[in-house]
């Protein structure tokens, strides 16, 4: 299917959304796909509210881009660092951050920039451009996915044809748009380790803030006599946690290789030097 036909199909889907329950939410993350669905919503002429749920850990320049796009900003009840102080760092298997910071309902009908092309998991999970999601507490939201079948090439062509300005993370030093780049929470455990290291290199102050927040969590757990297995493995040291999670495939492998070296190798100094952290 050509891009023009995909655009027509997307606009028809948006225009078909019932308005009996009021304004339609355009779920805006600041990423390239949300820029595309925002532009499509404008082209479709629907009554919408573009809403950005501030995760408090998006890359530098994201918030400025959100405001430049005229998108409404909703602040979380609790920011990410406070969550870490209370619950520790999220993992691939325990992602409490998503539910609390961005995956919560606002309006009963919502448009999302999900694409099956993004990952095998999404391709398996999303089969149709319309679905009903039930959130914790029983709240139901009808979700619409107008670019579900779009490829990266489709997104790139649409962005360039419509002259859409995307977030800074999508441009190289010469100002060229790179559709393969991603915008997500800095340090997200779902990203691969190389990508996470690159994100922290771009945002070293955020890494330092997360280390301090995790250290607060460890200190409280240790004082209460309730240290987690990960805390014990890391010797109650948040720098060790980040070193292990960013440079090793698992904490088990880190433990096997480095337990006897913890006090011979200054991990904190290494991390500060690697990520160019200046106090």
Predicted features and spans:
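ATP-dependent adenylation/nucleotidyltransferase module used to activate substrates
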Residues: 1-162, 279
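ATP/NTP-dependent adenylation/nucleotidyl-transfer catalytic domains that generate, transfer
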Residues: 22-23, 167, 171-279
């Amino acid at each position: 299917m050509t891009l023009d036909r995909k655009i027509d199909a997307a606009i028809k889907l948006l225009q078909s959304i019932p308005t009996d329950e009021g304004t339609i939410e355009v779920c805006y993350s600041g990423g390239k796909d949300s820029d595309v669905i925002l532009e499509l919503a404008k082209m479709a002429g629907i009554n919408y509210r573009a809403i950005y749920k501030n995760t408090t850990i998006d890359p530098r320049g994201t918030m400025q881009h959100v405001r430049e796009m005229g998108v409404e900003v909703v602040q979380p009840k609790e920011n990410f660092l406070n969550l870490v102080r209370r619950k520790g760092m999220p993992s691939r298997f325990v992602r409490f951050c998503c539910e609390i910071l961005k995956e919560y309902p606002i309006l009963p009908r919502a448009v999302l920039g999900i694409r099956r092309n993004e990952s095998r998991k999404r391709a398996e999970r999303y089969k149709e451009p319309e679905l009903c999601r039930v959130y914790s507490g029983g709240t139901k939201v009808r979700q619409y996915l107008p670019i579900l079948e779009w490829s990266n090439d489709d997104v790139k062509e649409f962005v360039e044809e419509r002259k859409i300005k995307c977030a800074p993370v999508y441009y190289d030093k010469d100002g060229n748009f790179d559709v393969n780049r991603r915008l997500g929470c800095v340090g997200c455990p779902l990203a691969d380790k190389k990508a996470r290291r690159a994100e922290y290199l771009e945002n070293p102050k955020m890494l330092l803030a997360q280390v301090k927040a995790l250290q607060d969590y460890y200190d409280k757990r240790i004082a209460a006599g309730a240290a987690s297995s990960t805390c014990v493995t890391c010797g109650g040291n948040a720098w060790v946690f980040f070193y292990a999670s960013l440079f090793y495939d698992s904490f088990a492998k880190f433990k096997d290789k480095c337990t006897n070296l913890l006090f011979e190798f200054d991990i904190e100094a290494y991390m500060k030097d690697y990520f160019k952290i200046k106090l």
